[in-house]
Amino acid sequence: LLETTTIMRHFFITLYLLGISLFSSAQQEEKAALLITHYGSSDPQTRALTLDVVTREAQEAFPQFTVREAYISPIVRKRLAKEGVYKDSPTDALLKLRAEGYRTIYVQSTTLIEGSEMTSVRRDADKLRPFFKEIKVGNPLLYSVEDCEKVIGILTAEQPEKKEDIVYVGHGNQLPSTATYAMLDFMMKAHGLKNF
């Protein structure tokens, strides 16, 4: 379990760092923010080990930005609200940042593929773009073949025992982007990685 948690942590951190190119052009004197969007999790332990770590490490990696987080899933936000935990939607987070005087926003989602959640994040940013000087939205982790190559390198850095297999599970959808998971599997097999 600890090894899986470590792999997941590195996985999400890598997702975040792959979006770094978006943020390199920000002007330091301007009030800018980084909005990390997560699908969300209603499990406190999962949040603490993954999503909270990504948000915290984003703030450490980019101290020049105010870092905020938002949860994409309305179902997760409703469940959390019943427990007294309140998370903003991407739209709400953007509106709050605007009200606080932020004019440049960089949005990076922790979603894996260009699925319905990522489409939702892009739509929210587009809807509010006229109210900001600039909103840039980063791509999901598995956006290009090059991204998949980098992720394969990270996921396979520690090889399983010969009689062990590692299974990665991604949440698909009805969009063609679900084929990204099949592409990742094919690429792993092409690299001779039979235990993944």
Set out the residue ranges of the language-model regions.
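Active-site-proximal alpha-helix that buttresses catalytic centers in soluble enzyme cores
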Residues: 27-196
